[in-house]
Amino acid sequence: QQEKIFNAMKKAFDGQGREIGSRELEEILATVLDNRSVTVPLTVERVQDEVERTLMERGHYEVAKAYILYREKRSALRRVRHTIARTVGDDSLDEVLRRIQMDFTEEVYSLAALQMKFESFCRPGMTEDERAEALTKAAVELTTAEAPKWEFIAARLLNHSFRCRNAQEWEGRGVGDLYGRLRYLTDKGLYGDYILAHYTHEEIAMAEDFLCPERDELFTYSGLDLLLKRYVIQSRSRVPLETPQEMFLGIALHLAMNEGSDRMGWVKRFYDMLSRMEVTMATPTMSNARKPYHQLSSCFVDTVPDSLDGIYRSLDNFAKVSKFGGGMGMYFGKVRAAGSTIRGFQGAAGGVIRWIRLVNDTAVAVDQLGMRQGAVAVYLDAWHRDLPEFLQLRTNNGDDRMKAHDVFPAVCYPDLFWRLAEENIDAPWHLMCPHEILTVKGYALEDYWGTEWEKRYLDCVNDPRIEKRSVTVKDIVRLVLRSAVETGTPFAFNRDSVNRMNPNGHTGMIYCSNLCTEIAQNMAPIEHISTEVHTENGDTVVVTATRPGEFVVCNLASLSLGNLPVEDEAYMERTVETAIRALDNAIDLNFYPLEYARLTNQKYRSIGLGVSGYHHMLAKRGIHWESDEHLAFTDAVFELINYAAVKADTALALEKGRYALFE
C-alpha cells in the first residue's frame, strides 16, 4: 500500500514537470502515515485525503491540485467499472475491466463508451449470461478502423465469460486439476487415451505449470470466438470443456509424445511457440491433436483413375479425408472426355464434369460433424477436351447441371501454352481426350512433361486418328480470365516448372497440387489388382487387393511473422527448429484416414513450413510496400527462415536417418 501511495505522489509531481527527490517523497509519505487516525478505519479515501492535506501543508499547491484531479479521474474509472460489473451481475468482472483500463489508456477506449453501448443492449429479464454476452457484443460493435483494439477488449470479455462458465462446468463435475480433467475427458471418449498412457501423473502436473493464462490476451475477439466454437474440446452437447491454453498444451503433449529424455522440455517448447502465437499448426492438427481420431495432416492429393471403380474409390477416399478435416486435391487429367468411347461404344462417356459434380456433393455432405463442409480442388490439364466446360464450373450463367459451385477448379499448364500466349496468342490450341490418346498411341500424354511432353503433344496433333477440339490460345485465356473475374478460379499449376524442380524426380512425376496449390509431390493412381473370395474362420469374405500408388500427404505449419522478432537470428533459428521437429513428429503420431496416405507419408516424410502475418510484419516496422527496403528486408527474412529450416532438417536426418527415397 505504501508503494502505491509513493508512486501516485511521484506521478503527480512528474505530471507537473516538478522534480522531487526520493528523500522528500519519503518524508511526505511518513507524514501521511503519521497522520492516520487509530480510531477511524483506514480506507483508500482517507489515505488520499491525507496525501492532499500534506502536499498543501508543504506548499505543493499545483501538485496537490493535479493529485486531486488524478484522484477524481481514478474515482470515475472505478465508478464505471463498478456500474458495468453490477449491471452484468458479476463482481469478478471488475478486475478484468481494471486491467482493460490499465492496458488501453487512449480516450477512444474509454469504458464509459462501452457502458453506453452495453446499456443500449440491455433489456428487462435478461439472464447474467445474456448480459455478459451483450457486453461483449457492445465491445465488438465499437471496433472500427480508427479504434481497432476494441476487438482485443471484446476478446478479454468473451474469455472472462467463458472461463467463468468453464470453471462452473468442472466444479459441477467435481473435477479439479489438469490430470483430473484429462482423466475425465479420456473416460468420456473425448480425449485420446494415448496421452495418459504416455505421460505420468507427475508429468501432467509439471505440464500444468507451463500454462500461461495471460496469453489469452493475445487473442482478438474473432480468433477466440472461432477457437471456442471449433477447436477446443466440447462435450457431445457442444459445451466447451477445454480452455485455449489447455488446447495448446494438449497439442504440445501429443506432438512431444515420442520424444526421449527431454520430452517435457519439448512439450514446453511446443506449448510456448503455439500459445505465444509465433507458430500456427495446420487446422487438422489444432483441431484433432490430443483427440481419439487424431488426423493431423492438412493436405491430400489423389490421382483419379479412368475407371468406374477407380473414380468411386477416389470419391470414397475424399469422403474419408474430409471426415477428419483434410483438404483434397484431385487430378482428373486421366479421366476420358465427354463423347469418348466406353468399351468401344462411340460417344458413351459423359466426361469429367459429371464426376466433379459428385465430388462437389461429397464435399457438402461430409461436413466434419457439422463444423465445416469439405474442401477440394479439382485439376485438369490445359489440353483436356473438357476444358471449356471445366472453366465454367463456378460461373453463374449456363446450364446448372454442368455446375459445381463448391469445388475449386485448377488448370495444369505446360510451358508450351504460355509460350504461345506470349509469342502468338492466336495460335491454334488442340484439346484432346487422354483415353483416346492412350488407345491410339499406346501412351498416356499426361505422364510426360517438358520437351518430351511437347514432342508427344505435337505427335498427337499430327495424328488424324485422334479427334481434336481446336480453339485458339486466346479463346482459352479469355475463358480463364472471365472465370477468374467472376469466381477467383481457376488456380494455376505450371506442371513443367514444378517437375523441373522436383527433388524426387528420380522416382516419379507430379501431375497437380493440393487445395492450396502449395505442395508438389510425386503422384500415382491407386491400381486394382484382384478381388478374391476366401474363407476365414468359417466365414466367406471378399478380399480386394490394390497397389497403393502415391497418395500425397503433407503436414503444414505457419510462422506468424507479425508475432516474431525476425531480426533476432538465434530466436528465429530456435523457433524454426521447434516447428520443424513438431511437423516431423506429426508424421509418426498421425491417425491416417487411409492406409494409402500412411504409406506415402512415411515414404517421403514431407512437411511444409510456410508463413502468415507477412503484411503485419511490414506494417509493425513501418516498411512501405513499394520500396527497395521492403525487398531487401524480405530477402533477409526468408533467407534466414530457409537456412534455419534446412539446418533443422539436416539435424533431424543425422538424429533419425534420412527418408527412404532420398538421393
Task: Describe these PLM feature segments.
Residues Q1-E663:
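Extended catalytic cores of very large enzyme megasubunits
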